Amino acid sequence: LASDALLGRNTPSPGLDTAAAYIARQFQQAGLQPVRGAWTQEVRMQTIALGDSNALTLTVNGKDTAFAIKDDFVPFDMTADRLVQGDLVFAGYGITAPDLTYDDYDGVDVRGKIVVIFRHEPRENDTTSRFNSRKNADRWGMAAKVKRAREHGAVGMLVMNEPLSHMSLTPRGYPWPSLSRIIPKDALPMTLMADDTEKIPVVHVGERV
C-alpha cells in the first residue's frame, strides 16, 4: 500500500483503485465474507473549490466593515454556497450535551440568525475534563456543531479560536489550495455528496473580525 507505484493513492486516482483491489484480494484470501456479494461499496463524493466571490461584511451602528478572505476569514469545506445575512448571536462552544447537563443553546434564540461559537470544547487542554475531546471527538467536532446550529434554526455560523487556549487567532477554516503556496492546486477537499439546502455557511474568523 505504500508502494511508490501507487503514486500516493490520491482520491480519486488509479493508484487508489489498485490499492482497493489489493485489499479486496487480501480479504478474500483471509476467508472473509463479502457484504451483499461485493468487496467494495459505492460512496458518492465530490471535490469542491473555493469560489472567487467570497465576502464577509459586518454592520455595526450603520457602518459596514468588509473583511479579507484568508487574513480575516476562511470558509470551512462543509460550508453552503449561498449569501446569508442576519444578527449575530453568541452561543459559547455550540455544544448540547444533556448527559453532562450542559447546553450552550439553553435560553439562546438563534433562529434566523448567524451563530458565533468557539472551536473545540471547554477546558480543551485538560485531559481530566468531562469534555475530553479524545473521548468525544465526534460530539464536539465541527460537523456536530453545524448540525446542532441548523437544528436550532441558525442560517450561518462564525467560528473563532478561544483566546485563553489558543495563542493564534488566525483563521484556518480549510487549507484551500487557492489560498496556499504549498498545497498542490489539484488537492481539493472531498466531501460526501449532499443537498446544499441541508447546509449553512460556516466560516472561521480571525482576531480582526
What name fits each language-model region?
Residues 1-2, 42, 88-91, 114-118, ...:
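Structural recognition of the beta-strand scaffold that forms the well-ordered cores
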Residues 1-9, 194-196:
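Acidic/histidine-rich, surface-exposed loop or edge segments in extracytoplasmic proteins
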Residues 7-128, 170:
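Noncatalytic luminal/extracellular "stalk/propeptide" segments of secretory-pathway proteins
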Residues 9, 13, 135, 199-203:
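Hydrophobic alpha-helical scaffolding
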Residues 14-26, 38, 141-148, 153, ...:
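Extracytoplasmic/secreted proteins, especially bacterial periplasmic and envelope-associated proteins
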Residues 70, 151-164, 168, 176-209:
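Long, well-ordered, tryptophan-enriched scaffold segments
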Residues 125-136, 142:
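Proteins synthesized as precursors that undergo proteolytic processing into mature forms
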Residues 131-133, 172-177:
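Short secondary-structure boundary/capping segments
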